[in-house]
Amino acid sequence: MTQTFADQKRKTVETAEFTEDGRYKRKVRSFVLRTGRLSEFQKNMMNDNWGTLGLDYQTEPFDFAKIYGNDNPVVLEIGFGMGKSLVDMAFANPDKNYLGIEVHTPGVGACIAYAVEKGGTNLRVICHDATEILRDSIADGALGGLQLFFPDPWHKAKHHKRRIVQPHFVAQVVQKLAGNGFIHMATDWENYAEQMLEVLSANTDLVNTSKNGDYIPRPDFRPLTKFEARGHRLGHGVWDLYFVKK
């Protein structure tokens, strides 16, 4: 049976940690590969539009000026889910370039479909482990900002080590940010918000924009996500953090 590009992309993500040279092998992962069904529509969207909207992992830094056709700042979003808020932000901010990373192929397919519907040329998506993209495919100082909205909270204490927001992750992101680049995080888990605040505040290259030294009100430019709406329904608060590189 012939595999389509979308099938191969899913296979690549699912087997990445088992390659013979060990390059993709990681002991602790911040995500779980969900096995949701990739619909025929999503598959077709990926197959038909990957050449214009998709980027593949590579071992040398992306040439963003060539990819986007301009020198506008690049905002990276990790874990965009189904991609609606990412596409909406890209459409609302044509003066910025957006790069989204998601390992869940149905989400990638849905994001591409919505991007095609909305139009615009300032969005690209990647279906790969974000830590490897940061490590190998993005040059130091190349990003205008990082967005991390409602990452997996790994709410059990024994799983907190799996949370993506750790000192080494933040240090890696800061290295990739240009001067005055931002890190914007949001979560509906108070314990995770506290960890985010602690880790971000401990990095001496970052400045908290909160007047109180903790969280900021939800900014108008961040679209309401389904995770945030779920949090409201469950009676959870939502915490936004916005730090800037010195």
Curated annotation (Swiss-Prot):
Transmembrane segments: none annotated. Its EC number is 2.1.1.33. GO terms for molecular function: tRNA (guanine(46)-N7)-methyltransferase activity. It comes from the Bacteria. This is tRNA (guanine-N(7)-)-methyltransferase. Belongs to the class I-like SAM-binding methyltransferase superfamily. TrmB family. GO terms for cellular component: tRNA methyltransferase complex. Keywords: Methyltransferase, S-adenosyl-L-methionine, Transferase, tRNA processing. HAMAP family: tRNA_methyltr_TrmB. Substrate binds at K156, D188, T225, K226, F227, E228. Pathway: tRNA modification; N(7)-methylguanine-tRNA biosynthesis. The active site is at D152. Catalyzes the formation of N(7)-methylguanine at position 46 (m7G46) in tRNA.
